[in-house]
Amino acid sequence: GKIMGCFGLTEPDHGSNPGGMISNFKSDGDYVILNGSKMWISNSPFADIAVVWAKDENKRIHGLIVERGMDGFTTPETHNKWSLRASSTGELIFDNVRVPKKNILPGKSGLGAPLMCLDSARYGISWGAIGVAMDCYSTALKYSLERIQFGKPIAAKQLQQKKLAEMLTEITKAQLLSWKLGKLKNEDRAT
């Protein structure tokens, strides 16, 4: 069979500061008790498992695998997003969730492991942003060719041409930057 997963690091009050997370777990025999929440998590409303990052009793960050159906684990969907509407997004809420200790990811603690995953995700996100920018450019170009002012398309005006050229220059710079990063990643030289 197939299993869908999600990655839970971002918290409601600590989105750009993962070190400030408050999600935590405490030892309880062969289990840990997980409390806290995550927000803006892609695939959370239907994921079978969630790789979640939380602090232990010593304030060290660890990854845990939380399975759908565990008591106290809910995944409400976020509605009315303004962007990335093709992906289902939601929250991960942990209310005294009993997670087996065997579900703690071995060998990694601290922020290094989750941030490594984010670095790869951000590379992909850069291409998505470039795609959006390219669509904006195409829309602006089409509009400037169709919009007639004083008997001519506004695309015939030097100021409009300058704005479109600057737009395309910035998009091309972003493409080249992301292409170069991809090349470095393929060569294991991205730092």
Question: Language-model segments: which ranges?
Answer:
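A short, Trp-centered hydrophobic/proline-enriched beta-strand micro-motif
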Residues: 1-10
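Glycine-rich beta->alpha junctions and the first turn(s) of the following alpha-helix
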Residues: 74-172
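Buried hydrophobic positions in well-ordered alpha/beta secondary-structure cores of metabolic enzymes
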Residues: 7, 34-36, 64, 94, ...
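Charged, glycine-rich active-site and insertion segments that engage polyanionic ligands
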Residues: 188-191
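A short core secondary-structure module
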Residues: 31, 35-75
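A structural signal for short hydrophobic beta-strand segments in well-ordered beta-sheet cores
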Residues: 23-26
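Short Gly/Pro-enriched turn/cap motifs at secondary-structure boundaries
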Residues: 13-16, 40-43, 55, 81-88
